[in-house]
Amino acid sequence: MSAAMLLAPGDVIKRSSEELKQRQIQINLTDWTEGETNKESKAERKEGDKAEELKDGEGRNRRAARRKRAAKETKDARCDRRIHTAVGSGSSAKGPGERANENVDRGDGKVGGGGGDADAGVGTTGANGGRWVVLTEEIRRAIESKYGTKIDVYRDEVPAQIIEVERSLQKELGISREGVAEQTERLRDLRRKEKSGAHAKAAERGRRKQGKKPHGDAQREGPEEEKTSEEPASVGITIEGVMSQKKLLSMIGGVERKMAPIGARESAVMLVSNSIKDVVRATAYFTAPTGDPHWKEVAAKLQKRRTIRYTSTGGDVKTEFLHLIDHL
């Protein structure tokens, strides 16, 4: 497919505009929000005009009532001067439209939180100075691809310092379900061996192979050897759960690689649009739940023309839309 035109709902295109520009893809967006805003503004103006008219009417009525009362009072004063000789004509009555001013201080104070990162402050090597390892080949590949840092897979060696990639970081690295299950199985095996003391014995054998105990001292240090072999497996194996990218990078070193976006010359899509005028030229269209009021009509015309349709699977619509563009 070459020089493809993809139609999609306006709000989907608008949300993806930055990524589309990075891919050098043209955008033809019929903005429906301006029309809606104008309608709302007109409605608000009409309501405001009505309110003003009502207010003016009430004001005129109040003034007429005051004049009527003043005229009546003047007439009464003239009719009975003996009673009203010292009476003033001022009125202290408040008009029906007057209200007491309310000065409400809400005091919306903001409480600052000490959102420190609990993952910070971990060195590039473990507690015993050894290098960190991971439990599966898939995790190793993902880390190397994303951060450019080489890391080994655990091969039952003792001692060892193991990174357990937890759920949030699994998503960040794009680990598959199979990869997650493989890590879980290996962790279970490690804990089972830890209970049996197998790793503690292996660690002791490793120390003896390195020549830390001369053969001549074997009989003399026999009881001490037995004592050492009963040490818990935690002496030989360290497992560190990692949830954040920041902590992982502090342990293994490296920085995140920024992937270059797919450009227009690499993608078949040259233009995206939500305009009904582009229906005749559309190669395909992507449809999803939308707030674009015109999209229903556009989609109906595309369907009549039997244009190739791609439908959202219910996940993140923007991600699905960009994935489709990159793979058309």
Swiss-Prot record:
Its EC number is 3.6.4.13. Keywords: ATP-binding, Capsid protein, Hydrolase, Inner capsid protein, Nucleotide-binding, Virion. GO terms for molecular function: ATP binding; hydrolase activity; structural molecule activity. Residues 36-61, 71-83, 96-109, 180-205, 214-230 have a biased composition (Basic and acidic residues). Residues 31-128, 180-237 are annotated as: Disordered. Its main location: virion. It holds the Pfam family Orbi_VP6. Disulfide bonds: none annotated. ATP binds at residue 110. It catalyses: ATP + H2O = ADP + phosphate + H(+). Homohexamer. Belongs to the orbivirus VP6 family. ATP dependent RNA helicase essential for RNA packaging and viral transcription. Possesses ss- and dsRNA-binding capacity. This is Helicase VP6-A. It is an enzyme of class 3 (hydrolase).
